[in-house]
Amino acid sequence: MMLTTLRDANPIWNEVFANVDFLMVGTLERLGENGSLSESAALAALLLAKSLRLNHVALPLEEAELTRLCTEQLWTIRDESGGFSQAADIPHAATIQAGVQELRVLGPAVIDIQALDVPVSLTGTPLLISTRDGVPWFLSYRRYAYAEEIITSRLINAAHSTDLLDGVTGDEVVRTLGKIPMSEVGEQAIRFAVERKLSIITGGPGRGKTTVIASLLVGLRLTAERRGKKFSVALCAPTAKAAVRMEEAIKGQVSSLGETWEDLQRFVQIDDRSGSVHRLLGIRPDNTKSLRHLDHDFVIVDEVSMLDVSLLAKVIEHAPSTHLVFVGDADQLASVNVGAALRDMIDGAELAGLSGIVSKLNVNYRFRSEIDEFASAINRGNADEALEVMSRHPDVIRRATKADDLVRENVQWAQDLQMSAIASARGETSPSDLIAK
């Protein structure tokens, strides 16, 4: 059945899903028999599209998790207050699972998530069904499954092996810092960065992330000078503006540690192509595939929470021998594109028991304690505690206004518009559909 017909027959769909969701499913529809999909297949594809928009890289198909996700996030509509509430007639998990089976007419790849030696290929039809013990477990787009596999593989390899540059250990670099004050977690972060192909430094604002990075660079400089060698380093962030802020902050912190930027660069060569991730990789509108190989000793990426999974995977894929140091606040807003890459890496490493990767900085050096207390309650999802902190400090923390609701709506509109523009650029929809938004 044509998607337009299905929308007419299911008016609730027009409230639950956004135009961009229908645009994505319309692309799949053209691959179906006679250019159409069954109702349950279209429903499954729409739920996948919305889950991507909400920063989930896949749609879980296990009954309990699928039901929970639909109830809390996917089967929701905007209410009178400007927020979201549960819509009526939540589809049964069995209906969605049946729709996934019917999507097989599109020829999606089927892989066993327990078969770690079977890589995901970028070549083939758009969809991919991941199974567990022969049972469908996730529905995803192939390109995101491919990106997730690259990230996961690097995490596992980094946790299970050390990689020393000319025998330089983390302890050696930490010892060179001498009397420079460092927290125990900060020293651990430097050790991980020096000895692992991938490490993560995370913490909220004012937790000392920049101090740790500056200390790492100073420690590398002192080690290189003592050994008579040089290290090559690239600094980058998701946007050019973030990259400028990163470099300025690091320079300031290096200076506070008693070093000059010029002396540091005698032994730690900072790539002059440092800047945005796109600039470092050589990504341009006319070049998205022939990317630059990153052969630096270290690549330090700030504000990683802003990176989507595909871009993060590109960094990893093009830096096979580099020590990657990812820095960011996992509790910040995730990328406007697909995936909460930093949060997923941290949670994934913790769930899998992968050690030697993540360093969490928890000491607050910047904010008033009441703001820190309020933010902590929000991050834990404890609404009662957050309200109690607000009531004790009305001069510091204020309630949201209608203007804040307007900001949220504009952000959602901008995200929808961006996805529509991408679809139009790929020829998956017409410019008139973009203008209609």
Segments from the language model and where they lie:
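Walker B catalytic acidic pair
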Residues: 302-303, 328
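N-terminal accessory nucleic-acid engagement/regulatory domains that precede
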Residues: 2-168
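N-terminal pre-P-loop "Q-motif" helix
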Residues: 179-195
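Conserved helicase motor core of P-loop NTPases
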Residues: 226, 331, 335-437
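Conserved lysine of the Walker
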Residues: 209
